[in-house]
Regions:
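N-terminal leader/targeting and accessory segments in enzymes
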Residues: 1-72, 291, 302
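Residue-level signal for inorganic ion chemistry
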Residues: 2, 47, 70, 88, ...
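Short beta-strand "acidic-cap" motif of Rossmann-like dinucleotide-binding folds
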Residues: 7-12, 113-114, 134
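Short internal beta-strands
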Residues: 8-14, 187-190, 281-285, 303-309
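Walker A (P-loop) phosphate-binding motif
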Residues: 73-116
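Conserved substrate/cofactor phosphate-moiety recognition/catalytic segment
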Residues: 112-129
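Flexible active-site lid/hinge loop adjacent to a nucleotide/diphosphate
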Residues: 128-208
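Nucleotide phosphate-binding/pyrophosphate-handling subdomain across enzymes
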Residues: 210-304
Length: 309
Protein backbone atom coordinates (compact mmCIF):
# COMPACT_ATOMS: atom_id res chain seq x y z
CA UNK A 1 0.00 0.00 0.00
CA UNK A 2 1.14 3.55 -0.73
CA UNK A 3 -0.82 5.03 2.16
CA UNK A 4 1.14 6.00 5.22
CA UNK A 5 4.37 5.97 3.25
CA UNK A 6 6.56 8.97 2.54
CA UNK A 7 5.30 11.38 -0.10
CA UNK A 8 6.69 10.66 -3.52
CA UNK A 9 6.99 12.62 -6.75
CA UNK A 10 6.97 11.45 -10.33
CA UNK A 11 9.29 12.68 -13.05
CA UNK A 12 9.85 11.83 -16.70
CA UNK A 13 12.83 11.96 -19.03
CA UNK A 14 11.99 15.36 -20.49
CA UNK A 15 13.98 18.19 -18.92
CA UNK A 16 10.93 20.41 -18.50
CA UNK A 17 11.13 20.45 -14.70
CA UNK A 18 14.07 20.40 -12.33
CA UNK A 19 14.04 18.17 -9.27
CA UNK A 20 12.69 20.21 -6.33
CA UNK A 21 15.22 20.97 -3.61
CA UNK A 22 13.24 19.15 -0.91
CA UNK A 23 13.67 16.00 -3.00
CA UNK A 24 17.33 16.57 -3.83
CA UNK A 25 18.34 17.42 -0.25
CA UNK A 26 16.42 14.64 1.50
CA UNK A 27 19.12 12.25 2.70
CA UNK A 28 16.56 9.54 3.45
CA UNK A 29 15.82 9.15 -0.27
CA UNK A 30 18.24 6.72 -1.85
CA UNK A 31 18.69 7.06 -5.59
CA UNK A 32 20.25 4.37 -7.75
CA UNK A 33 20.95 4.96 -11.41
CA UNK A 34 21.78 1.74 -13.23
CA UNK A 35 21.63 0.34 -16.74
CA UNK A 36 19.25 -2.35 -17.93
CA UNK A 37 21.97 -5.02 -17.93
CA UNK A 38 22.64 -4.38 -14.22
CA UNK A 39 18.98 -4.58 -13.21
CA UNK A 40 18.14 -7.46 -10.85
CA UNK A 41 14.64 -8.48 -11.91
CA UNK A 42 14.28 -10.76 -8.89
CA UNK A 43 14.09 -7.69 -6.66
CA UNK A 44 11.25 -6.06 -8.62
CA UNK A 45 7.68 -6.58 -7.41
CA UNK A 46 6.02 -4.45 -10.09
CA UNK A 47 6.75 -1.48 -12.34
CA UNK A 48 4.64 1.64 -12.78
CA UNK A 49 4.90 2.58 -16.44
CA UNK A 50 4.12 5.98 -17.93
CA UNK A 51 1.35 5.60 -20.56
CA UNK A 52 3.50 7.45 -23.10
CA UNK A 53 6.45 5.07 -22.74
CA UNK A 54 7.24 2.88 -25.75
CA UNK A 55 5.55 -0.45 -24.99
CA UNK A 56 7.94 -2.21 -27.38
CA UNK A 57 10.98 -0.95 -25.46
CA UNK A 58 13.56 -3.55 -24.45
CA UNK A 59 12.94 -3.02 -20.74
CA UNK A 60 9.21 -3.75 -21.17
CA UNK A 61 10.03 -6.97 -23.03
CA UNK A 62 12.44 -7.97 -20.25
CA UNK A 63 9.79 -7.28 -17.60
CA UNK A 64 7.29 -9.47 -19.45
CA UNK A 65 9.89 -12.20 -19.92
CA UNK A 66 10.49 -12.20 -16.15
CA UNK A 67 6.73 -12.21 -15.41
CA UNK A 68 6.89 -8.88 -13.59
CA UNK A 69 3.63 -6.98 -13.31
CA UNK A 70 3.43 -3.70 -15.25
CA UNK A 71 0.93 -1.15 -13.96
CA UNK A 72 -0.33 2.26 -15.00
CA UNK A 73 -0.75 5.24 -12.69
CA UNK A 74 -4.52 4.85 -13.04
CA UNK A 75 -4.29 1.23 -11.95
CA UNK A 76 -2.38 2.28 -8.82
CA UNK A 77 -5.02 4.94 -8.11
CA UNK A 78 -7.89 2.47 -8.51
CA UNK A 79 -6.20 0.00 -6.16
CA UNK A 80 -5.33 2.54 -3.45
CA UNK A 81 -8.19 5.06 -3.41
CA UNK A 82 -11.48 4.05 -1.77
CA UNK A 83 -13.76 6.56 -3.50
CA UNK A 84 -16.33 5.42 -6.05
CA UNK A 85 -14.92 5.58 -9.55
CA UNK A 86 -16.40 6.13 -13.01
CA UNK A 87 -14.06 5.31 -15.92
CA UNK A 88 -14.66 7.13 -19.22
CA UNK A 89 -12.98 6.07 -22.46
CA UNK A 90 -13.53 6.34 -26.19
CA UNK A 91 -11.72 7.65 -29.24
CA UNK A 92 -13.29 11.08 -28.81
CA UNK A 93 -15.69 12.85 -26.43
CA UNK A 94 -13.96 11.61 -23.25
CA UNK A 95 -13.08 15.01 -21.81
CA UNK A 96 -16.49 16.53 -22.54
CA UNK A 97 -18.34 13.63 -20.91
CA UNK A 98 -15.98 13.51 -17.92
CA UNK A 99 -16.32 17.23 -17.18
CA UNK A 100 -20.10 17.15 -17.70
CA UNK A 101 -20.38 14.31 -15.20
CA UNK A 102 -18.19 16.20 -12.74
CA UNK A 103 -20.38 19.30 -13.01
CA UNK A 104 -23.76 17.59 -12.78
CA UNK A 105 -22.83 15.16 -10.00
CA UNK A 106 -21.33 18.03 -7.98
CA UNK A 107 -24.44 20.17 -8.43
CA UNK A 108 -26.52 17.28 -7.07
CA UNK A 109 -24.71 17.71 -3.76
CA UNK A 110 -22.16 14.92 -4.15
CA UNK A 111 -18.43 15.62 -4.07
CA UNK A 112 -17.01 14.66 -7.47
CA UNK A 113 -13.93 15.46 -9.51
CA UNK A 114 -12.73 14.54 -13.02
CA UNK A 115 -9.10 13.43 -13.30
CA UNK A 116 -6.83 11.39 -15.57
CA UNK A 117 -6.09 11.90 -19.24
CA UNK A 118 -7.75 15.36 -19.28
CA UNK A 119 -4.68 16.97 -17.69
CA UNK A 120 -5.14 16.18 -13.98
CA UNK A 121 -2.66 13.41 -13.08
CA UNK A 122 -4.42 10.77 -10.99
CA UNK A 123 -1.61 10.28 -8.47
CA UNK A 124 -1.92 13.92 -7.40
CA UNK A 125 -5.30 12.95 -5.89
CA UNK A 126 -4.56 9.48 -4.55
CA UNK A 127 -4.99 10.45 -0.89
CA UNK A 128 -8.18 12.49 -1.41
CA UNK A 129 -11.58 10.95 -0.79
CA UNK A 130 -14.56 11.97 -2.94
CA UNK A 131 -18.04 10.60 -3.45
CA UNK A 132 -17.03 10.04 -7.08
CA UNK A 133 -13.86 10.33 -9.10
CA UNK A 134 -14.53 10.46 -12.85
CA UNK A 135 -11.40 9.15 -14.57
CA UNK A 136 -10.67 9.77 -18.25
CA UNK A 137 -8.79 6.73 -19.54
CA UNK A 138 -6.81 6.52 -22.80
CA UNK A 139 -5.93 3.41 -24.80
CA UNK A 140 -2.33 3.89 -23.63
CA UNK A 141 -3.50 3.50 -20.02
CA UNK A 142 -5.65 0.49 -20.86
CA UNK A 143 -2.79 -1.26 -22.65
CA UNK A 144 -0.73 -1.36 -19.45
CA UNK A 145 -3.58 -1.84 -16.94
CA UNK A 146 -4.75 -5.22 -15.71
CA UNK A 147 -7.03 -4.45 -12.81
CA UNK A 148 -9.24 -1.38 -13.31
CA UNK A 149 -11.83 -2.39 -10.75
CA UNK A 150 -14.30 0.52 -10.91
CA UNK A 151 -17.95 1.09 -10.14
CA UNK A 152 -18.83 2.15 -13.69
CA UNK A 153 -17.00 1.96 -17.01
CA UNK A 154 -18.38 3.70 -20.10
CA UNK A 155 -17.00 3.42 -23.64
CA UNK A 156 -18.25 6.23 -25.90
CA UNK A 157 -17.05 5.14 -29.35
CA UNK A 158 -14.20 3.45 -31.20
CA UNK A 159 -12.71 4.71 -34.47
CA UNK A 160 -9.21 4.68 -35.97
CA UNK A 161 -6.56 6.26 -33.74
CA UNK A 162 -3.09 5.52 -32.33
CA UNK A 163 -2.50 2.65 -34.76
CA UNK A 164 1.17 3.64 -34.87
CA UNK A 165 1.30 2.43 -31.27
CA UNK A 166 -1.25 -0.39 -31.29
CA UNK A 167 -0.20 -1.82 -34.71
CA UNK A 168 -3.70 -2.72 -35.94
CA UNK A 169 -7.28 -1.54 -35.55
CA UNK A 170 -8.22 -4.97 -34.18
CA UNK A 171 -5.67 -4.55 -31.36
CA UNK A 172 -6.96 -1.04 -30.67
CA UNK A 173 -10.56 -2.29 -30.46
CA UNK A 174 -9.59 -5.08 -28.06
CA UNK A 175 -7.63 -2.67 -25.86
CA UNK A 176 -10.54 -0.22 -25.69
CA UNK A 177 -13.00 -2.99 -24.79
CA UNK A 178 -10.70 -4.15 -21.99
CA UNK A 179 -12.03 -1.15 -20.03
CA UNK A 180 -14.93 -3.33 -18.91
CA UNK A 181 -12.77 -6.09 -17.39
CA UNK A 182 -13.65 -5.61 -13.73
CA UNK A 183 -16.21 -2.79 -13.76
CA UNK A 184 -19.34 -3.47 -11.72
CA UNK A 185 -21.47 -1.65 -14.33
CA UNK A 186 -20.43 -1.55 -18.00
CA UNK A 187 -21.99 0.92 -20.47
CA UNK A 188 -21.40 1.10 -24.22
CA UNK A 189 -22.57 2.91 -27.34
CA UNK A 190 -25.47 0.89 -28.76
CA UNK A 191 -24.74 2.04 -32.31
CA UNK A 192 -21.01 1.34 -32.38
CA UNK A 193 -20.37 -2.12 -33.85
CA UNK A 194 -16.82 -2.13 -32.44
CA UNK A 195 -18.03 -2.07 -28.83
CA UNK A 196 -18.63 -5.51 -27.36
CA UNK A 197 -22.11 -6.87 -26.71
CA UNK A 198 -23.37 -8.27 -23.42
CA UNK A 199 -22.67 -5.19 -21.32
CA UNK A 200 -24.82 -4.03 -18.41
CA UNK A 201 -26.39 -1.21 -20.43
CA UNK A 202 -26.15 0.81 -23.64
CA UNK A 203 -26.84 4.42 -24.60
CA UNK A 204 -28.10 5.67 -27.98
CA UNK A 205 -25.28 6.89 -30.18
CA UNK A 206 -25.71 9.70 -32.68
CA UNK A 207 -23.84 11.30 -35.58
CA UNK A 208 -24.30 14.55 -33.66
CA UNK A 209 -21.53 14.34 -31.08
CA UNK A 210 -23.22 16.68 -28.57
CA UNK A 211 -26.33 14.50 -28.59
CA UNK A 212 -24.32 11.29 -28.17
CA UNK A 213 -22.37 12.81 -25.27
CA UNK A 214 -25.56 13.85 -23.47
CA UNK A 215 -27.02 10.37 -23.96
CA UNK A 216 -23.88 8.87 -22.44
CA UNK A 217 -23.99 11.23 -19.45
CA UNK A 218 -27.69 10.49 -18.94
CA UNK A 219 -27.04 6.73 -18.82
CA UNK A 220 -24.28 7.11 -16.21
CA UNK A 221 -26.50 9.37 -14.07
CA UNK A 222 -29.27 6.79 -14.29
CA UNK A 223 -26.91 4.11 -12.93
CA UNK A 224 -26.05 6.23 -9.87
CA UNK A 225 -29.70 7.19 -9.27
CA UNK A 226 -29.39 10.78 -10.47
CA UNK A 227 -31.98 10.87 -13.23
CA UNK A 228 -31.94 14.00 -15.36
CA UNK A 229 -34.14 14.79 -18.40
CA UNK A 230 -32.63 15.61 -21.78
CA UNK A 231 -33.93 19.17 -21.50
CA UNK A 232 -32.25 19.58 -18.12
CA UNK A 233 -29.03 18.06 -19.46
CA UNK A 234 -28.94 20.51 -22.37
CA UNK A 235 -28.64 23.35 -19.86
CA UNK A 236 -25.29 21.87 -18.83
CA UNK A 237 -24.06 21.31 -22.37
CA UNK A 238 -20.63 22.77 -22.97
CA UNK A 239 -17.43 22.05 -24.83
CA UNK A 240 -13.89 21.95 -23.46
CA UNK A 241 -11.30 24.40 -24.74
CA UNK A 242 -10.31 24.04 -28.40
CA UNK A 243 -13.39 21.96 -29.24
CA UNK A 244 -15.41 23.80 -31.95
CA UNK A 245 -14.52 27.22 -30.52
CA UNK A 246 -15.71 30.13 -32.67
CA UNK A 247 -12.84 32.57 -32.16
CA UNK A 248 -13.68 35.09 -34.91
CA UNK A 249 -16.56 36.11 -37.18
CA UNK A 250 -15.96 38.67 -39.92
CA UNK A 251 -18.32 41.25 -41.43
CA UNK A 252 -19.42 38.77 -44.08
CA UNK A 253 -20.59 36.31 -41.44
CA UNK A 254 -17.74 33.87 -41.99
CA UNK A 255 -16.89 32.00 -38.81
CA UNK A 256 -13.40 30.85 -37.86
CA UNK A 257 -13.52 27.77 -35.64
CA UNK A 258 -10.75 26.22 -33.56
CA UNK A 259 -11.27 22.46 -33.31
CA UNK A 260 -7.66 21.54 -32.56
CA UNK A 261 -8.82 19.09 -29.90
CA UNK A 262 -9.98 16.87 -32.78
CA UNK A 263 -6.80 14.81 -33.06
CA UNK A 264 -8.25 11.82 -34.94
CA UNK A 265 -10.51 11.10 -37.90
CA UNK A 266 -13.60 10.27 -35.83
CA UNK A 267 -13.57 13.58 -33.98
CA UNK A 268 -12.98 15.53 -37.20
CA UNK A 269 -15.83 13.73 -38.98
CA UNK A 270 -18.17 14.57 -36.08
CA UNK A 271 -17.11 18.22 -36.27
CA UNK A 272 -17.84 18.39 -40.00
CA UNK A 273 -21.23 16.70 -39.56
CA UNK A 274 -22.18 19.17 -36.84
CA UNK A 275 -21.94 22.07 -39.33
CA UNK A 276 -25.17 21.53 -41.23
CA UNK A 277 -25.83 23.56 -44.40
CA UNK A 278 -22.54 25.44 -44.05
CA UNK A 279 -19.82 26.05 -46.60
CA UNK A 280 -16.68 24.64 -45.01
CA UNK A 281 -12.97 25.19 -45.59
CA UNK A 282 -11.03 22.78 -43.39
CA UNK A 283 -7.39 23.06 -42.32
CA UNK A 284 -5.79 19.75 -41.31
CA UNK A 285 -2.36 18.75 -40.08
CA UNK A 286 -0.46 16.66 -37.57
CA UNK A 287 0.58 13.04 -37.22
CA UNK A 288 -1.32 10.36 -39.14
CA UNK A 289 -0.83 7.79 -36.35
CA UNK A 290 -1.44 4.96 -38.81
CA UNK A 291 -5.11 5.87 -39.29
CA UNK A 292 -7.37 4.97 -42.22
CA UNK A 293 -8.39 8.32 -43.73
CA UNK A 294 -10.94 6.97 -46.23
CA UNK A 295 -14.04 7.82 -44.17
CA UNK A 296 -12.73 11.30 -43.38
CA UNK A 297 -11.83 11.87 -47.03
CA UNK A 298 -15.34 10.85 -48.06
CA UNK A 299 -16.91 13.28 -45.56
CA UNK A 300 -14.64 16.10 -46.73
CA UNK A 301 -15.59 15.38 -50.36
CA UNK A 302 -19.28 15.61 -49.47
CA UNK A 303 -19.30 18.71 -47.28
CA UNK A 304 -16.14 20.81 -47.69
CA UNK A 305 -15.46 23.49 -50.29
CA UNK A 306 -11.71 23.16 -49.84
CA UNK A 307 -9.11 21.45 -47.66
CA UNK A 308 -5.74 22.88 -46.63
CA UNK A 309 -3.10 20.44 -45.38
Amino acid sequence: SLKGKKNFKIFDTRNVHKLPLDFVNDESIKTNLISLKDLNFELIEYVICSPGFDYDHEIIQQLKKNNISIKSDIEIFVEENNSKKILVSGTYGKTTVSLLLERIISLSGLDSYAIGNLGRPVLDYIELEKDYFIIEVSSFHLQISNNLNADIGILLNISHDHLDRHKSFENYVNIKNSLFGKCKVSIGNKNDKNIKRGLTSYFEGSEKIDEANLNAVSKVLEKIDLNCSQEELKKFSFRPKHRMEVFHEDKLGRKFINDSKATNCGATISAIKSLENEKIVIICGGQGKGADFSELTSEIDKKCEAVII
